[in-house]
Amino acid sequence: MAQLRWLGHAATLLTFGNKNVIIDPMIKDNPLSPVKLDYFKNNLDIIIVTHDHYDHLGDTVELLRMNPKAKLFATYDLEAHLAETYKISEESIIPANVGGFVEVDGIKLALTKAVHSSTHSDPTGAIVSAEGITVYHAGDTGLFEDMKLIGEVFKPDYALLPIGGRFTMDPYQASISVELIKPKKGAIPIHYNTWDLIKVDVNDFVKLVKNKGYNPIVLQPGQTITL
């Protein structure tokens, strides 16, 4: 059974059977996180980082140390920086860049384009596919036309989209991205109302997405849905 749990901000936990995949794991400094870092001790298999801003890189290094068998999936440039800076072993790294799928323990992973900034590598989105379900996590991004290609190539069932504005898409722009991506089962807003700088009314996103004929799914921090 595939499940998705939103942990507040951009942090997202995907579960496929007994495998746990976390994306952009800011936990300790996340005022919306429903769990403490210890919750993940020996409980993660794959850690995905879309880019190196602190609210997305988050607790990645500590989580890798708490989960010796876990693998890091990010751009190779970012992985190399983290490996050199924090002495992360090569065995913990899945080398990758924007492109096709890499399969790890039956879970298919890919990185996509994102329009944002990042110090040690280009920013990305992420695709996770297993058990017949495909999830697109857009990372931090503005609206860009190639989102249509992401939808056509990966055909996501669910799209997690930042809507907080200022640093990423706002609700209106995110609703346009839904039209481009065409998620088959739902569009999930993330990266909003964590702090005042990205405070928006999520109902604006809901109304816009519904009016375009798609299914908005608003989660509370800690809420789990079956995919």
Curated annotation (Swiss-Prot):
Superkingdom of this protein's organism: Archaea
GO molecular function, one term: hydrolase activity
Keywords (A to Z) from UniProt: Hydrolase
SUPFAM superfamilies linked to this entry: Metallo-hydrolase/oxidoreductase
InterPro entries with a match to the protein in the record: Metallo-B-lactamas, RibonucZ/Hydroxyglut_hydro, UPF0173, UPF0173_UPF0282_UlaG_hydrolase
A Pfam family: Lactamase_B_2
Protein family: Belongs to the UPF0173 family.
Classification via NCBIfam families: PRK00685.1
Protein name in the entry: UPF0173 metal-dependent hydrolase SSO0099
Source species of the chain: Saccharolobus solfataricus (strain ATCC 35092 / DSM 1617 / JCM 11322 / P2)
Organism lineage string: Archaea, Thermoproteota, Thermoprotei, Sulfolobales, Sulfolobaceae
